[in-house]
């Protein structure tokens, strides 16, 4: 799961706005029972139980109140996770485009095209190195798991 430092500037600003909205007394804290409302407002879906466990973990003194930093750390777990899922979906799409026969693998020349499309500054040597690292068995093909491992590793 994510950490607060993985949040984008926009996400931090969005969380700050939401936090301030629920910090009615401007004490710099929100009540832990507000957290699920805020997360839902931000379009997050989650299991209540997971949220309760997280709150217990973050609100260590059991005060029932969270400061902005604590709230951010908690929200990051949900927001960053969603980004990771979205990224995985995009990578799956990229993989599918090249796996035209739906065999579950692509050949290394297709992989080279994908890598070049993602980063046009890569040299041929760097591409060769990356491919050698992924295609560890030298089969000339890369399956989706190997591909994901390389892209997210």
Curated annotation (Swiss-Prot):
Question: By its UniProt entry, which PROSITE patterns does this protein fall under?
Answer: EF_HAND_1 (PS00018), EF_HAND_2 (PS50222)
The Gene Ontology CC terms held by the record are: myosin II complex
* Keyword Metal-binding annotated: yes
Query: For binding Ca(2+) 2, which residues are annotated in this chain's numbering?
Result: 99, 110
Sorted alphabetically, which Pfam families does this protein's record hold? EF-hand_7
- Cited SUPFAM superfamilies: EF-hand
- Residues found modified as Blocked amino end (Ala): 1
**Presence of the UniProt keyword Aminoacyl-tRNA synthetase in the record:** no
Domain EF-hand residue range list: 10-45, 46-81, 86-121, 122-153
Binding-site residues, Ca(2+) 3: 135, 137, 139, 141, 146
Q: Name one GO molecular function term.
A: calcium ion binding
Q: So where does Ca(2+) 1 get bound?
A: 59, 61, 63, 65, 70
Say which family it is in.
Belongs to the troponin C family.
* Functional summary from the UniProt entry: Troponin is the central regulatory protein of striated muscle contraction. Tn consists of three components: Tn-I which is the inhibitor of actomyosin ATPase, Tn-T which contains the binding site for tropomyosin and Tn-C. The binding of calcium to Tn-C abolishes the inhibitory action of Tn on actin filaments.
> Per its record, how is this protein called by name?
Troponin C
Upper lineage ranks?
Answer: Eukaryota, Metazoa, Ecdysozoa, Arthropoda, Chelicerata
